[in-house]
């Protein structure tokens, strides 16, 4: 374990004293460091009447138990403090370590000992081996009582709210859209968990089309075949119009108003970051949206109709929209329990809706936590004029996702009444996505949130993985860079795949979010400042660093070679079929120079930290009137790399007081032969730009530019890079087995590494 402490807020000695005393630690400004430390440690043993016995079982040094040390006249030193601090944080001498000084240094222990009360204050805010901070662990053990009121420590809310006595209620918010065109504004189901208190509370809202269930069997039937020809597209220029995000003014007329919800629930799937803050006094709201189980309308999959329906929930929390107690629309109900301040949460589609909601500029949305979210749906299902499936899901497209999330049809009565109209709508959508050509068009433009980044007012927190080939890093990169310069924004860029990071051992992500939420939603003047970019170092285990930005302008140019080289697109039928059945076998062969590709290896002559988009400038020609080029950059070498999927440790991360416990996790540092750094794909007809389609003349040289997926990746002098240039990608692109070649003039081609 390594300590990477970004949530701790430095305080004055007076504040440290006051906060320690308020929690029941009997420290004194007049007592010695040793006396205060003894009092602190004895308080730690909440379940012991005889704390002498507990102290006897801990050590102050290899020859002295802790009780004997406290009874002696020896002063408290950095070495004793460090050894005891390790035991307080759950580390076991002679098991986890033998040399405490070396162990503390290796773990980057964040506390510089000076004997002050600030040391004890910071120790409480430090992560234990089990994943909770020491203060959260003690509160879960009833250090302080449940009060159903806010208690803050170091600018963060503690788990003082009763999660056994929550309000669990359902309302149906009236949206400004009628997506199924039945003449009624669509209602969306809102599931609410909130503390049982008599004062207004803020809310964490998760907009998830998956929340009420999914229609997987129907979606599977729509999965597209990836085998087929790459079509020649007519040359031309694509024209677009800017979408309008305008909703009619809401009707706020009350109808037989009531103050209590009619509908309750016993259980719903939850998001653990929401659970964590629910125990700390922030309501938790889940909204599936239009076209889902027990909501109304059709699933419009990423357009602003869907977004405005979610926005209506934030409007309702602020008195700007109506909600009903049931879909019969007989009684309206207000959110009289809500302060109106909201943060959105969630990963993938959930993070996507966070991005989209932020671009509405809705009042009340104070903070957005967008984890691995899409910022432009074209960049999820397409790339540079090509069909490019999200990693791991070849054959999926927006129509299959629409069917997957249209859970309204799981209610037989709804199916009976609406399926015919829905199928007509789905057919229109399937045509509009244009799988035939793969081009950007008005349909995709209507689902591009980046163009409205200037409207974002909320503080934005992104998390994204360098190995996320599902929602690729271009999505966070372009949104992060498009936000107004004056806006507060933050990015946690890790080395994982499409994964949550709020229960990772190596970083205090959820505690950082606690501090930021208290500042933005509870108006707590805690002085907290989160760095702009927090990056997980790819070269070592559990190491995080602060960077100034994502995307740099400097570039190191690498000439690709001195001769021409060709890529054969065609495979023998047996190999083509094998790769189609198991795309991982294709990737294995590709990376080890066993597939149809140009494989180029380079040894770096300097240290470099890639930050941005690797750019390829290629001089190419195709033997036919079409073609695509794919590229991947890898670090080669048999050594340890961070694996993309976190390993689960123990089920001991407590999100309250024995509430919604989850598994601690971390990216393992494992031996491997290579690591993918970045990748990209381009239709040769889109070589100029996304909106220009040009003819490809057989055997005529063209100069193309290809920006690969953005990343941050550190390399040392002597490290080996491998650039692989190929055509068909069996994981991502259309599988065209036509017999043609793409030739690259390596002497006129180069790769630029941004740093």
From Swiss-Prot:
SMART domains: PepX_C, PepX_N. It catalyses: Hydrolyzes Xaa-Pro-|- bonds to release unblocked, N-terminal dipeptides from substrates including Ala-Pro-|-p-nitroanilide and (sequentially) Tyr-Pro-|-Phe-Pro-|-Gly-Pro-|-Ile. It is found in: Cytoplasm. The keyword Protease applies. GO terms for biological process: proteolysis. Signal peptide: none annotated. Keywords: Aminopeptidase, Cytoplasm, Hydrolase, Protease, Serine protease. InterPro entries: AB_hydrolase_fold, Galactose-bd-like_sf, Pept_S15_Xpro, PepX_N_dom, PepX_N_dom_sf, Xaa-Pro-like_dom, Xaa-Pro_dipept_C. GO terms for molecular function: aminopeptidase activity; dipeptidyl-peptidase activity; serine-type peptidase activity. One of its GO terms (cellular component) is cytoplasm. Its EC number is 3.4.14.11. The active site is at 348 (charge relay system), 468 (charge relay system), 498 (charge relay system). Removes N-terminal dipeptides sequentially from polypeptides having unsubstituted N-termini provided that the penultimate residue is proline. Belongs to the peptidase S15 family. Homodimer. This is Xaa-Pro dipeptidyl-peptidase. It comes from Streptococcus thermophilus (strain ATCC BAA-491 / LMD-9). The lineage of its organism: Bacteria, Bacillati, Bacillota, Bacilli, Lactobacillales. The gene is pepX.
């Amino acid at each position: 374990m390594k300590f990477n402490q970004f949530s701790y807020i430095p305080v004055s000695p007076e504040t440290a004293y006051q906060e320690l005393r308020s929690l029941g630690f009997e420290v004194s400004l007049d007592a010695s460091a040793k006396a205060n430390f003894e009092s602190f440690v004895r308080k730690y043993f909440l379940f012991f009447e005889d704390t002498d016995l507990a102290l006897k079982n801990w050590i102050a040094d290899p020859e002295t138990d802790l009780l004997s040390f406290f009874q002696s006249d020896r002063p408290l030193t950095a070495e004793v403090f460090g050894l005891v601090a390790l035991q307080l944080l759950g580390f076991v001498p002679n098991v986890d370590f033998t040399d405490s000084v070396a162990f503390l240094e290796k773990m980057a222990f964040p506390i510089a000992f000076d004997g002050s009360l600030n040391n004890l204050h910071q120790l409480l805010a430090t992560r234990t081996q089990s994943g909770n901070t020491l203060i959260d662990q003690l509160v879960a053990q009833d250090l302080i009582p449940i009060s159903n009121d806010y208690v803050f420590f170091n600018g963060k809310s503690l788990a003082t709210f009763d999660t056994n006595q929550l309000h669990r209620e359902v309302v149906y918010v009236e949206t400004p859209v009628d997506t199924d065109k039945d003449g009624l504004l669509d209602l969306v189901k809102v599931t609410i968990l909130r503390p049982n208190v008599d004062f207004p509370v803020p809310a964490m809202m998760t907009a998830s089309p998956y929340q009420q269930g999914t229609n997987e069997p129907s979606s599977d039937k729509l999965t597209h075949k990836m085998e087929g020809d790459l079509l020649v597209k007519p040359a031309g220029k694509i024209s677009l119009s800017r979408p309008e995000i305008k909703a009619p003014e809401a009707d706020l007329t009350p109808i037989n108003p009531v103050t209590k919800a009619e509908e309750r629930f016993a259980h719903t799937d939850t998001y653990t970051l929401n659970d964590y803050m629910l125990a700390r006094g922030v309501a938790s709201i889940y909204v599936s949206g239009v076209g889902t189980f027990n909501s109304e309308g059709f699933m419009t999959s990423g357009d602003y109709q869907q977004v405005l329906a979610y926005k209506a929930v934030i409007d309702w929390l602020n008195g700007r929209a109506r909600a009903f107690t049931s879909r019969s629309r007989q009684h309206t109900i207000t959110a009289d329990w809500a302060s109106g301040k909201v943060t959105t949460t969630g990963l993938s589609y959930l993070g996507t809706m966070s991005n989209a909601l932020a671009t509405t500029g809705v009042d009340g949305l104070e903070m957005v936590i967008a984890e691995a979210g899409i910022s432009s749906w074209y960049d999820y299902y397409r790339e540079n004029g090509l069909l490019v499936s999200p990693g791991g899901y070849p054959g999926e497209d927006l129509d299959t996702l629409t069917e997957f999330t249209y859970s309204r049809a799981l209610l037989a009565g709804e199916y009976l009444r609406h399926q015919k109209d829905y199928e007509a709508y789905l057919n229109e959508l399937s045509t509009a996505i244009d799988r035939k050509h793969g081009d950007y068009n008005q349909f995709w433009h209507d689902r591009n949130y980046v163009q409205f980044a200037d409207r974002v007012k909320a503080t934005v927190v992104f998390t994204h993985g360098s190995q996320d080939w599902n929602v690729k890093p271009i999505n966070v990169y372009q949104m992060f860079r498009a936000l107004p310069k004056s806006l507060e924004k933050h990015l946690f860029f890790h080395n994982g795949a499409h994964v949550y990071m709020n229960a990772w051992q190596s970083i205090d992500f959820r505690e950082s979010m606690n501090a930021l939420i208290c500042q933005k939603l509870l108006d707590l003047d805690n002085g907290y400042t989160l760095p702009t970019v927090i990056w997980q170092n790819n070269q070592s285990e559990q190491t995080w660093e602060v960077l100034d930005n994502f995307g740099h302008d400097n570039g190191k140019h690498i000439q690709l070679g001195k001769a021409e080289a060709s890529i054969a697109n065609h495979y023998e039928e047996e190999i083509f079929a094998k790769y189609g059945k198991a795309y991982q076998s294709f990737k294995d062969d590709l990376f080890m120079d066993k597939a149809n590709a140009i494989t180029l290896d380079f040894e770096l002559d300097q240290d470099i930290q890639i930050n941005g988009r690797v750019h390829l400038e290629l001089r190419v020609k195709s033997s036919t009137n079409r073609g695509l080029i794919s590229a991947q950059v890898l670090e080669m070498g048999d050594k340890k790399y961070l694996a993309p999927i976190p390993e689960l440790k123990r089920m001991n991360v407590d999100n309250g007081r024995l509430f919604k416990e989850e598994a601690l996790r971390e990216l393992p540092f494992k031996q491997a032969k290579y690591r993918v750094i970045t990748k990209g794909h381009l239709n040769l007809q889109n070589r100029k730009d996304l909106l220009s389609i040009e003819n490809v003349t057989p055997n005529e040289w063209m100069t193309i530019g290809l920006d690969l997926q953005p990343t941050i990746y550190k390399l040392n002098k002597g490290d080996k890079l491998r650039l692989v240039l190929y055509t068909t990608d069996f994981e991502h692109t259309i599988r065209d087995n036509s017999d043609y070649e793409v030739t690259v003039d390596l002497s006129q081609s180069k790769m630029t590494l941004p740093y």
